[in-house]
Protein backbone atom coordinates (compact mmCIF):
# COMPACT_ATOMS: atom_id res chain seq x y z
CA UNK A 1 0.00 0.00 0.00
CA UNK A 2 1.35 3.42 -0.93
CA UNK A 3 2.05 6.11 1.65
CA UNK A 4 -0.85 8.21 0.36
CA UNK A 5 -3.26 5.28 0.71
CA UNK A 6 -1.97 4.60 4.22
CA UNK A 7 -2.66 8.20 5.20
CA UNK A 8 -6.16 8.15 3.69
CA UNK A 9 -7.07 4.95 5.55
CA UNK A 10 -5.19 5.86 8.71
CA UNK A 11 -6.92 6.25 12.10
CA UNK A 12 -8.05 9.69 13.23
CA UNK A 13 -5.07 9.99 15.59
CA UNK A 14 -2.70 9.84 12.63
CA UNK A 15 -4.69 12.49 10.78
CA UNK A 16 -4.40 14.78 13.80
CA UNK A 17 -0.61 14.70 13.40
CA UNK A 18 -1.05 15.67 9.76
CA UNK A 19 -2.72 18.88 10.92
CA UNK A 20 -0.66 19.65 14.04
CA UNK A 21 2.61 17.83 14.66
CA UNK A 22 2.61 15.80 17.86
CA UNK A 23 -1.16 15.57 18.46
CA UNK A 24 -1.30 11.99 17.24
CA UNK A 25 1.55 11.00 19.53
CA UNK A 26 -0.26 12.62 22.48
CA UNK A 27 -3.40 10.64 21.69
CA UNK A 28 -1.36 7.41 21.62
CA UNK A 29 0.04 8.21 25.07
CA UNK A 30 3.49 9.32 23.90
CA UNK A 31 3.37 12.50 25.96
CA UNK A 32 7.01 13.63 25.89
CA UNK A 33 7.47 12.93 22.18
CA UNK A 34 4.20 14.65 21.33
CA UNK A 35 5.09 17.71 23.41
CA UNK A 36 8.50 17.94 21.74
CA UNK A 37 6.88 17.92 18.30
CA UNK A 38 4.33 20.54 19.40
CA UNK A 39 7.05 22.76 20.90
CA UNK A 40 9.10 22.44 17.72
CA UNK A 41 6.07 23.43 15.67
CA UNK A 42 5.42 26.39 17.96
CA UNK A 43 9.04 27.54 17.65
CA UNK A 44 8.90 27.31 13.86
CA UNK A 45 5.62 29.23 13.74
CA UNK A 46 7.04 31.96 15.99
CA UNK A 47 10.22 32.21 13.89
CA UNK A 48 8.41 32.47 10.56
CA UNK A 49 5.85 34.90 11.98
CA UNK A 50 8.55 37.09 13.55
CA UNK A 51 11.01 37.26 10.65
CA UNK A 52 11.29 33.98 8.73
CA UNK A 53 8.57 34.83 6.20
CA UNK A 54 10.12 38.26 5.68
CA UNK A 55 13.55 36.67 5.19
CA UNK A 56 12.13 34.27 2.59
CA UNK A 57 10.62 37.20 0.71
CA UNK A 58 13.89 39.12 0.99
CA UNK A 59 15.81 36.49 -0.93
CA UNK A 60 13.71 37.39 -3.98
CA UNK A 61 13.65 41.19 -3.57
CA UNK A 62 17.08 41.77 -1.97
CA UNK A 63 15.54 44.76 -0.22
CA UNK A 64 12.99 47.42 -1.06
CA UNK A 65 13.73 50.16 1.47
CA UNK A 66 16.56 52.54 0.60
CA UNK A 67 18.53 53.97 3.52
CA UNK A 68 18.22 57.72 4.09
CA UNK A 69 20.15 59.08 7.06
CA UNK A 70 18.66 62.57 6.68
CA UNK A 71 15.15 61.24 7.10
CA UNK A 72 16.19 58.67 9.69
CA UNK A 73 15.23 55.74 7.46
CA UNK A 74 17.19 52.57 8.20
CA UNK A 75 17.25 50.84 4.85
CA UNK A 76 17.63 47.20 3.88
CA UNK A 77 21.00 45.49 3.56
CA UNK A 78 20.83 43.37 0.39
CA UNK A 79 23.56 40.88 1.27
CA UNK A 80 22.27 40.49 4.81
CA UNK A 81 18.83 39.79 3.39
CA UNK A 82 20.30 37.23 1.00
CA UNK A 83 22.12 35.28 3.68
CA UNK A 84 19.20 35.47 6.12
CA UNK A 85 16.92 34.31 3.32
CA UNK A 86 19.17 31.31 2.76
CA UNK A 87 19.06 30.60 6.49
CA UNK A 88 15.26 30.76 6.35
CA UNK A 89 15.31 28.26 3.47
CA UNK A 90 17.43 25.91 5.59
CA UNK A 91 14.99 26.27 8.49
CA UNK A 92 12.13 25.53 6.09
CA UNK A 93 13.89 22.39 4.87
CA UNK A 94 14.41 21.36 8.50
CA UNK A 95 10.71 21.99 9.21
CA UNK A 96 9.67 19.78 6.28
CA UNK A 97 12.05 17.02 7.42
CA UNK A 98 10.64 17.27 10.94
CA UNK A 99 7.09 17.09 9.60
CA UNK A 100 7.92 13.97 7.56
CA UNK A 101 9.51 12.32 10.60
CA UNK A 102 6.40 13.17 12.62
CA UNK A 103 4.14 11.50 10.03
CA UNK A 104 6.36 8.42 9.76
CA UNK A 105 6.52 8.10 13.53
CA UNK A 106 2.76 8.31 14.06
CA UNK A 107 2.14 5.85 11.20
CA UNK A 108 4.54 3.38 12.81
CA UNK A 109 2.85 3.86 16.17
CA UNK A 110 -0.60 3.28 14.64
CA UNK A 111 0.57 0.02 13.01
CA UNK A 112 2.00 -1.17 16.32
CA UNK A 113 -1.26 -0.28 18.10
CA UNK A 114 -3.27 -2.17 15.45
CA UNK A 115 -1.21 -5.26 16.26
CA UNK A 116 -2.10 -4.89 19.91
CA UNK A 117 1.34 -3.71 20.94
CA UNK A 118 1.91 -0.89 23.36
CA UNK A 119 3.42 2.25 21.77
CA UNK A 120 7.05 2.89 22.62
CA UNK A 121 7.74 5.17 25.56
CA UNK A 122 10.10 8.11 25.14
CA UNK A 123 12.90 6.14 26.79
CA UNK A 124 12.37 3.22 24.41
CA UNK A 125 12.40 5.61 21.44
CA UNK A 126 15.71 7.07 22.63
CA UNK A 127 17.14 3.57 23.05
CA UNK A 128 16.04 2.66 19.51
CA UNK A 129 17.63 5.86 18.16
CA UNK A 130 20.88 5.06 19.97
CA UNK A 131 20.89 1.43 18.86
CA UNK A 132 19.13 0.51 15.65
CA UNK A 133 19.29 4.01 14.14
CA UNK A 134 22.53 5.18 15.70
CA UNK A 135 23.95 6.15 12.30
CA UNK A 136 21.09 8.63 11.86
CA UNK A 137 21.54 10.12 15.33
CA UNK A 138 25.31 10.37 14.92
CA UNK A 139 25.03 12.18 11.58
CA UNK A 140 22.56 14.84 12.69
CA UNK A 141 25.08 17.27 14.19
CA UNK A 142 27.71 16.83 11.42
CA UNK A 143 25.06 17.41 8.75
CA UNK A 144 23.81 20.54 10.50
CA UNK A 145 27.39 21.79 10.87
CA UNK A 146 28.23 21.13 7.21
CA UNK A 147 25.01 22.81 6.11
CA UNK A 148 25.67 25.90 8.24
CA UNK A 149 29.40 26.37 7.71
CA UNK A 150 30.01 24.82 4.27
CA UNK A 151 26.84 24.61 2.19
CA UNK A 152 25.41 27.99 3.23
CA UNK A 153 28.55 30.03 2.33
CA UNK A 154 28.94 28.17 -0.98
CA UNK A 155 25.32 28.76 -2.00
CA UNK A 156 25.64 32.38 -0.86
CA UNK A 157 28.68 32.84 -3.11
CA UNK A 158 26.95 31.19 -6.07
CA UNK A 159 23.89 33.40 -5.71
CA UNK A 160 26.02 36.52 -5.30
CA UNK A 161 27.46 35.85 -8.76
CA UNK A 162 23.99 36.52 -10.16
CA UNK A 163 23.57 39.94 -8.54
CA UNK A 164 25.01 43.37 -9.31
CA UNK A 165 26.49 43.69 -5.82
CA UNK A 166 29.91 45.36 -5.81
CA UNK A 167 31.67 48.43 -7.12
CA UNK A 168 29.26 51.31 -6.59
CA UNK A 169 26.44 48.95 -5.57
CA UNK A 170 27.35 48.36 -1.93
CA UNK A 171 25.42 49.10 1.24
CA UNK A 172 23.46 51.36 1.61
CA UNK A 173 22.73 51.04 -2.14
CA UNK A 174 20.31 48.18 -2.80
CA UNK A 175 21.50 45.31 -4.96
CA UNK A 176 19.31 43.39 -7.40
CA UNK A 177 19.37 40.13 -9.30
CA UNK A 178 21.40 40.61 -12.46
CA UNK A 179 23.69 38.91 -14.97
CA UNK A 180 25.92 41.97 -15.18
CA UNK A 181 28.92 40.15 -13.66
CA UNK A 182 28.74 37.43 -16.32
CA UNK A 183 28.22 39.99 -19.07
CA UNK A 184 31.42 41.71 -17.96
CA UNK A 185 33.69 38.67 -17.66
CA UNK A 186 32.33 37.01 -20.81
CA UNK A 187 32.05 40.23 -22.80
CA UNK A 188 34.59 42.02 -24.98
CA UNK A 189 35.31 44.92 -22.63
CA UNK A 190 38.27 45.52 -20.35
CA UNK A 191 37.05 43.02 -17.74
CA UNK A 192 36.30 40.35 -20.34
CA UNK A 193 39.68 40.83 -22.02
CA UNK A 194 41.46 40.51 -18.69
CA UNK A 195 39.46 37.39 -17.85
CA UNK A 196 40.40 35.73 -21.14
CA UNK A 197 44.11 36.47 -20.80
CA UNK A 198 44.28 35.37 -17.17
CA UNK A 199 42.26 32.20 -17.86
CA UNK A 200 44.62 31.10 -20.65
CA UNK A 201 47.66 31.83 -18.49
CA UNK A 202 46.06 30.09 -15.49
CA UNK A 203 45.46 26.86 -17.43
CA UNK A 204 48.99 27.00 -18.90
CA UNK A 205 50.44 27.57 -15.43
CA UNK A 206 48.50 24.69 -13.86
CA UNK A 207 49.38 22.17 -16.59
CA UNK A 208 53.06 23.09 -16.96
CA UNK A 209 53.78 23.46 -13.24
CA UNK A 210 52.09 20.12 -12.48
CA UNK A 211 54.14 18.44 -15.23
CA UNK A 212 57.38 20.03 -13.98
CA UNK A 213 56.70 18.94 -10.42
CA UNK A 214 55.82 15.38 -11.42
CA UNK A 215 58.67 14.70 -13.81
CA UNK A 216 61.13 16.60 -11.61
CA UNK A 217 60.19 14.56 -8.54
CA UNK A 218 60.18 11.30 -10.51
CA UNK A 219 63.53 12.13 -12.10
CA UNK A 220 65.20 12.82 -8.76
CA UNK A 221 63.70 9.64 -7.28
CA UNK A 222 65.02 7.58 -10.22
CA UNK A 223 68.44 9.23 -10.03
CA UNK A 224 68.84 8.71 -6.29
CA UNK A 225 67.56 5.16 -6.62
CA UNK A 226 70.53 4.13 -8.78
CA UNK A 227 72.91 1.74 -7.07
CA UNK A 228 76.01 3.55 -8.33
CA UNK A 229 74.99 6.85 -6.68
CA UNK A 230 77.04 7.24 -3.53
CA UNK A 231 75.52 8.86 -0.47
CA UNK A 232 71.99 8.78 -1.88
CA UNK A 233 70.53 9.18 1.61
CA UNK A 234 72.47 12.40 2.10
CA UNK A 235 71.47 13.76 -1.32
CA UNK A 236 67.85 12.84 -0.66
CA UNK A 237 67.91 14.96 2.50
CA UNK A 238 68.47 18.22 0.60
CA UNK A 239 65.09 18.23 -1.20
CA UNK A 240 63.42 17.20 2.05
CA UNK A 241 64.93 20.27 3.76
CA UNK A 242 63.47 22.47 1.03
CA UNK A 243 60.11 20.77 1.61
CA UNK A 244 60.34 21.25 5.38
CA UNK A 245 60.85 25.03 5.18
CA UNK A 246 57.49 26.90 5.17
CA UNK A 247 56.52 27.81 1.63
CA UNK A 248 56.00 31.52 2.19
CA UNK A 249 59.53 31.82 3.66
CA UNK A 250 60.95 30.25 0.49
CA UNK A 251 58.86 32.60 -1.65
CA UNK A 252 60.03 35.68 0.24
CA UNK A 253 63.61 34.43 0.03
CA UNK A 254 63.42 34.08 -3.75
CA UNK A 255 61.71 37.47 -3.97
CA UNK A 256 64.72 39.03 -2.24
CA UNK A 257 67.19 37.13 -4.43
CA UNK A 258 65.55 38.30 -7.67
CA UNK A 259 64.71 41.83 -6.51
CA UNK A 260 66.24 44.90 -8.13
CA UNK A 261 68.90 45.19 -5.42
CA UNK A 262 69.13 41.46 -4.67
CA UNK A 263 72.21 39.22 -4.82
CA UNK A 264 71.61 38.05 -8.41
CA UNK A 265 71.45 41.58 -9.82
CA UNK A 266 74.44 42.58 -7.71
CA UNK A 267 76.44 39.76 -9.30
CA UNK A 268 75.29 40.86 -12.76
CA UNK A 269 76.28 44.48 -12.23
CA UNK A 270 79.58 43.48 -10.60
CA UNK A 271 80.44 41.44 -13.71
CA UNK A 272 79.72 44.39 -15.99
CA UNK A 273 76.16 43.47 -17.08
CA UNK A 274 73.00 45.49 -16.70
CA UNK A 275 70.58 44.64 -13.93
CA UNK A 276 67.52 42.66 -15.02
CA UNK A 277 64.00 43.61 -13.98
CA UNK A 278 63.01 40.11 -12.88
CA UNK A 279 59.90 40.98 -10.86
CA UNK A 280 59.34 44.66 -11.66
CA UNK A 281 56.12 46.15 -13.01
CA UNK A 282 57.41 46.46 -16.57
CA UNK A 283 56.47 44.52 -19.68
CA UNK A 284 59.98 43.11 -20.14
CA UNK A 285 59.67 41.32 -16.78
CA UNK A 286 56.58 39.34 -17.83
CA UNK A 287 58.22 36.04 -18.72
CA UNK A 288 61.06 36.50 -16.25
CA UNK A 289 58.50 36.67 -13.46
CA UNK A 290 56.50 33.76 -14.86
CA UNK A 291 59.60 31.60 -15.20
CA UNK A 292 60.71 32.40 -11.66
CA UNK A 293 57.23 31.39 -10.49
CA UNK A 294 57.62 27.98 -12.18
CA UNK A 295 61.04 27.58 -10.56
CA UNK A 296 59.88 28.54 -7.06
CA UNK A 297 56.81 26.30 -7.28
CA UNK A 298 59.03 23.41 -8.40
CA UNK A 299 61.41 24.09 -5.52
CA UNK A 300 58.53 23.82 -3.05
CA UNK A 301 56.57 20.95 -4.64
CA UNK A 302 59.11 18.56 -6.19
CA UNK A 303 60.33 17.11 -2.85
CA UNK A 304 56.87 15.78 -1.95
CA UNK A 305 56.55 14.08 -5.35
CA UNK A 306 60.06 12.68 -4.93
CA UNK A 307 59.15 11.12 -1.58
CA UNK A 308 55.97 9.53 -2.94
CA UNK A 309 57.55 8.18 -6.12
CA UNK A 310 60.51 6.79 -4.16
CA UNK A 311 58.14 4.53 -2.25
CA UNK A 312 56.24 3.60 -5.41
CA UNK A 313 59.41 2.72 -7.34
CA UNK A 314 60.54 0.38 -4.57
CA UNK A 315 57.37 -1.68 -5.10
CA UNK A 316 57.93 -2.34 -8.81
CA UNK A 317 58.96 -5.94 -9.46
CA UNK A 318 62.56 -5.91 -10.75
CA UNK A 319 61.82 -9.03 -12.81
CA UNK A 320 59.83 -6.82 -15.17
CA UNK A 321 62.97 -4.87 -16.03
CA UNK A 322 65.03 -8.05 -16.37
CA UNK A 323 62.50 -9.53 -18.79
CA UNK A 324 62.38 -6.27 -20.75
CA UNK A 325 66.18 -6.18 -21.00
CA UNK A 326 66.23 -9.76 -22.30
CA UNK A 327 63.69 -8.75 -24.95
CA UNK A 328 65.99 -5.92 -26.02
CA UNK A 329 64.03 -3.00 -24.61
CA UNK A 330 66.03 0.20 -24.16
CA UNK A 331 66.17 2.14 -20.90
CA UNK A 332 63.74 4.71 -22.29
CA UNK A 333 61.33 1.99 -23.44
CA UNK A 334 61.44 0.40 -19.99
CA UNK A 335 60.70 3.77 -18.45
CA UNK A 336 57.82 4.44 -20.86
CA UNK A 337 56.26 0.97 -20.69
CA UNK A 338 56.91 -0.09 -17.07
CA UNK A 339 57.93 2.72 -14.75
CA UNK A 340 55.73 5.54 -15.99
CA UNK A 341 52.43 3.58 -16.17
CA UNK A 342 52.99 2.10 -12.71
CA UNK A 343 53.82 5.46 -11.12
CA UNK A 344 51.03 7.35 -12.90
CA UNK A 345 48.52 4.71 -11.84
CA UNK A 346 49.54 5.03 -8.21
CA UNK A 347 49.82 8.80 -8.13
CA UNK A 348 46.91 9.94 -10.33
CA UNK A 349 44.75 11.21 -7.44
CA UNK A 350 47.76 13.12 -6.09
CA UNK A 351 48.44 14.65 -9.51
CA UNK A 352 44.81 15.77 -9.74
CA UNK A 353 45.17 17.36 -6.32
CA UNK A 354 48.41 19.03 -7.46
CA UNK A 355 46.70 20.37 -10.57
CA UNK A 356 43.84 21.86 -8.55
CA UNK A 357 46.30 23.25 -6.00
CA UNK A 358 48.41 24.84 -8.73
CA UNK A 359 45.33 26.22 -10.47
CA UNK A 360 44.39 27.96 -7.20
CA UNK A 361 47.95 28.77 -6.10
CA UNK A 362 47.42 32.20 -4.62
CA UNK A 363 50.73 32.54 -2.82
CA UNK A 364 53.40 32.13 -5.52
CA UNK A 365 52.94 35.35 -7.45
CA UNK A 366 51.34 37.25 -4.59
CA UNK A 367 54.48 36.87 -2.48
CA UNK A 368 56.89 37.22 -5.41
CA UNK A 369 55.41 40.42 -6.83
CA UNK A 370 53.48 41.79 -3.86
CA UNK A 371 50.08 41.82 -5.58
CA UNK A 372 51.06 44.60 -8.01
CA UNK A 373 48.76 45.59 -10.86
CA UNK A 374 50.16 45.98 -14.37
CA UNK A 375 50.05 49.43 -15.92
CA UNK A 376 50.39 47.92 -19.39
CA UNK A 377 48.74 45.21 -21.48
CA UNK A 378 45.15 46.30 -20.82
CA UNK A 379 44.77 44.39 -17.55
CA UNK A 380 41.89 45.42 -15.29
CA UNK A 381 43.07 45.44 -11.65
CA UNK A 382 45.50 42.59 -12.37
CA UNK A 383 49.03 41.83 -13.49
CA UNK A 384 50.34 39.58 -16.25
CA UNK A 385 51.34 36.92 -13.70
CA UNK A 386 48.08 36.90 -11.75
CA UNK A 387 46.05 33.71 -11.66
CA UNK A 388 42.27 33.80 -11.43
CA UNK A 389 42.46 33.41 -7.66
CA UNK A 390 44.79 36.45 -7.42
CA UNK A 391 42.51 38.51 -9.64
CA UNK A 392 39.52 37.44 -7.58
CA UNK A 393 41.31 38.72 -4.47
CA UNK A 394 42.13 42.06 -6.10
CA UNK A 395 38.56 42.51 -7.31
CA UNK A 396 36.67 41.53 -4.18
CA UNK A 397 38.93 42.39 -1.24
CA UNK A 398 40.73 45.47 -2.54
CA UNK A 399 38.13 46.96 -4.89
CA UNK A 400 34.72 45.65 -3.71
CA UNK A 401 33.73 43.98 -7.02
CA UNK A 402 32.05 41.17 -5.12
CA UNK A 403 29.70 39.81 -7.78
CA UNK A 404 32.48 39.60 -10.37
CA UNK A 405 34.70 37.87 -7.81
CA UNK A 406 31.91 35.40 -7.02
CA UNK A 407 31.42 34.69 -10.74
CA UNK A 408 35.16 34.06 -11.15
CA UNK A 409 35.20 31.70 -8.16
CA UNK A 410 32.31 29.81 -9.74
CA UNK A 411 34.27 29.54 -12.99
CA UNK A 412 37.28 28.22 -11.05
CA UNK A 413 35.11 25.59 -9.39
CA UNK A 414 33.56 24.47 -12.68
CA UNK A 415 36.92 24.22 -14.46
CA UNK A 416 38.81 22.41 -11.70
CA UNK A 417 35.89 20.17 -10.76
CA UNK A 418 35.09 19.18 -14.35
CA UNK A 419 38.69 18.57 -15.40
CA UNK A 420 39.47 16.63 -12.23
CA UNK A 421 36.43 14.40 -12.66
CA UNK A 422 37.09 13.77 -16.36
CA UNK A 423 40.78 12.99 -15.86
CA UNK A 424 40.13 10.66 -12.94
CA UNK A 425 37.27 8.82 -14.67
CA UNK A 426 39.45 8.26 -17.75
CA UNK A 427 42.59 7.31 -15.83
CA UNK A 428 43.90 3.79 -15.30
CA UNK A 429 43.62 4.33 -11.55
CA UNK A 430 39.83 4.27 -11.99
CA UNK A 431 39.29 2.03 -15.03
CA UNK A 432 42.00 -0.61 -14.48
CA UNK A 433 42.32 -0.82 -10.73
CA UNK A 434 42.78 -4.58 -10.76
CA UNK A 435 45.64 -4.45 -13.30
CA UNK A 436 48.28 -3.28 -10.82
CA UNK A 437 47.07 -5.18 -7.77
Segments the model singles out, each with a brief description of its role:
Residues 2-14, 19-27, 31-34, 38-46, ...:
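N-terminal signal-anchor/first transmembrane alpha helix
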Residues 49-59, 134-437:
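A structural signal for multi-pass alpha-helical bundles of membrane permease subunits
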Residues 60-64:
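Primarily recognizes Gram-negative and organellar outer-membrane beta-barrels
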